[in-house]
Amino acid sequence: GGPAGDFLSQGGASSEEIMAELEAARKDDNAKAVLIRINTPGGSTGATQEIVEEMDKIKNAGKPIVISMGDTCASAGYWIASKGDYIFASPATLTGSIGVYIDYTNVEGLAGKLGVTDEKIKSGAYKDMLSMYRPMVPEERAMLQGMVNDIYNQFVQSVAEGRHMDVAKVKTFADGRIMTGREAQNLGLVDAMGNYYDALDYAGGLVNMDGDVPVHTYDGGGSLRGFLNADMQHLGTWMGKGFADAVRSSAGTSSVSVR
């Protein structure tokens, strides 16, 4: 239950945990800036937007947000990062992956050879959309393409707003490609090359803190490091790690993935 549900398994952080940490930072009068370390290939669309909303609240409270990318900050990870005021990455960080795809498995032929039939009682013509036991009909394909286009446009618009770019410019590289941190900087998706401590120093400078910056860590038991570590036990709209084929359909499941 709760916002977006516990959409992860095997040690990943839920959106509830991440939002709670962001809320705590926003309400802490001693917190003058927020540094977010992101090391994730992605997560769910709805949860991503909930996290971004909390980030907007922090910025509206007058607290700057600095992003430090880890090994990977792709897809939903980049969606979140793009809302920061300043983004640091390492030259070899894997990022980008802005785009959307739907993947499902059709085993109708195999099931027929095995003598397996699928019977359903459903309330509407499209209730079993993405069934693995029948081909997709044109009307379903059109519906799903419309959904893909809508989510893609939301993703692109959010990145454009966060990075102060024209939507048309974002679309020139929002085709699902993975890029290095250096390539992302050349495209305007990253501000500077640097590690966590560089980002920490920069955040301190934004609030006129010289020397050692006092840090309080908000950690509700999860982190963006594990933002996507799911076994896809249900149909969902998912951001990310399509480049590593980590979000795939498996027997008995279908996935809608955004990357």
State where each predicted segment sits.
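N-terminal organellar transit peptides
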Residues: 1-74, 86-89, 102-259
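Short gly/pro/ser/thr-enriched loop/turn and capping motifs at secondary-structure boundaries
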Residues: 72-75, 94-98
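Alpha-helix C-terminal capping segments
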Residues: 79-86
